[in-house]
């Protein structure tokens, strides 16, 4: 039952992230990418901290499952490690803007669904045939959904792939840390790191004007509270029960949600190819869950 609830939480997070591209696009038209990432992270830190203070019972309910395994200093370092990895994933992805097409970038980014299981195998996790079949179908589906032109490898594509590696590593380090650190504390620390790095670089590389920030206050608040605050905290809570390779597959649905959101909200068009791609992704993810609990190495309790 806890696993099912965690999967529902992660699906909710994916829906938020899939729709967040609208706010991201609005904010990015006025502010630089580092400024957007830094401010949304700062807003998220304030939001989560206020919730922890005002609802202490909620904070206590997120106590680590492996009590006593990590000292206070280790918990802090785990949070910093998660934040550093997340920052590089987000920043490297931003570097690629304009260097490749959005479709190719979307496809290459979700290749972390392959990277995470690959890393997991070296860490001792076992994958069953259903997961492998589902993974292959998901990759094919994302290609149909995202790549609309001939696929040729360029520098921008390599940069996106590097960011995908960092996103995959982030899922792995969250999987380790979530069992040892309070979920809300871990979320706060990692977002503090992202905010410091992003705003620090933004002050050097970008021009920050208060009037510009105020002009996109609404999308920034939505990004900070919903996408970063609830989103990354929800991911940590969910990963206490869900193995990392399953997490990566569920999180990859963000691209599908974004495509559907584009149709419903921005009146974008989805053709037969993209529709087939989304269907193949969904079928692949459903297949990947068959007999999942029987073949996976159980998580530590």
Cite the ranges covered by each PLM segment.
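Helix-helix packing/entry segments at the starts of transmembrane helices
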Residues: 39, 105-111, 174-195, 228-264
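Hydrophobic/small/kink-forming positions within alpha-helical transmembrane segments
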Residues: 18, 22, 49, 83, ...
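Specific alpha-helical transmembrane segments that line the substrate/conduction pathway
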Residues: 35-46, 94-125, 163, 245-263
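C-terminal-most transmembrane helix of multi-pass membrane proteins
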Residues: 41-42, 49, 53-57, 216-218, ...
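Loop-to-transmembrane-helix transition segments
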Residues: 5-15, 61-92, 155-163, 202, ...
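Specific transmembrane alpha-helical segments of multi-pass solute transporters/efflux pumps
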Residues: 20-21, 49, 56-108, 142-144, ...
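Hydrophobic transmembrane alpha-helices of multi-pass small-molecule transport proteins
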Residues: 48, 127-147, 167, 198, ...
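Glycine-/small-residue-enriched transmembrane alpha-helix faces in small-molecule transporters
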Residues: 1-38, 84, 88, 92-95, ...
């Amino acid at each position: 039952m806890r696993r099912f609830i965690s999967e529902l939480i992660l699906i909710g997070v994916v829906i938020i992230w899939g729709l967040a591209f609208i706010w991201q696009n609005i904010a990015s038209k006025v502010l630089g990418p580092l400024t957007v990432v830094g401010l949304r992270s700062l807003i998220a830190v304030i939001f989560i901290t206020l919730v922890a203070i005002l609802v202490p019972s909620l904070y206590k309910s997120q106590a680590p499952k492996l009590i006593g395994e990590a000292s206070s200093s280790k918990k802090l370092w785990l949070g910093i490690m998660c934040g550093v990895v997340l920052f590089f994933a987000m920043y490297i992805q931003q570097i690629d803007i304009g260097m490749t097409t959005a479709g190719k970038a979307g496809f290459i980014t979700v290749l972390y669904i392959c990277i995470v299981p690959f890393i997991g195998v070296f860490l001792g996790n076992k994958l069953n045939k259903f997961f492998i079949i589902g993974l292959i179908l998901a990759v094919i589906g994302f290609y149909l959904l995202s790549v609309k032109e001939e696929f040729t490898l360029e520098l921008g594509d390599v940069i996106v792939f590097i960011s995908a590696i960092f996103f995959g590593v982030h899922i792995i380090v969250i999987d380790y840390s979530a069992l040892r650190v309070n979920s809300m504390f871990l979320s706060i620390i990692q977002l503090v790191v992202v905010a410091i790095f992003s705003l620090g670089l933004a002050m050097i590389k970008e021009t920050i004007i208060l009037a510009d920030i105020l002009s996109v206050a609404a999308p920034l608040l939505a990004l900070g509270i919903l996408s970063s605050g609830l989103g990354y905290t929800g991911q940590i809570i969910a990963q206490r029960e869900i193995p990392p390779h399953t997490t990566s597959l569920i999180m990859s649905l963000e691209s599908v949600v974004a495509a559907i959101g584009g149709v419903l909200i921005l009146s974008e068009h989805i053709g037969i190819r993209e529709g087939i791609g989304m269907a193949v992704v969904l079928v692949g993810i459903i297949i990947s869950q068959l007999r999942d609990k029987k073949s996976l190495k159980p998580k530590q309790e």
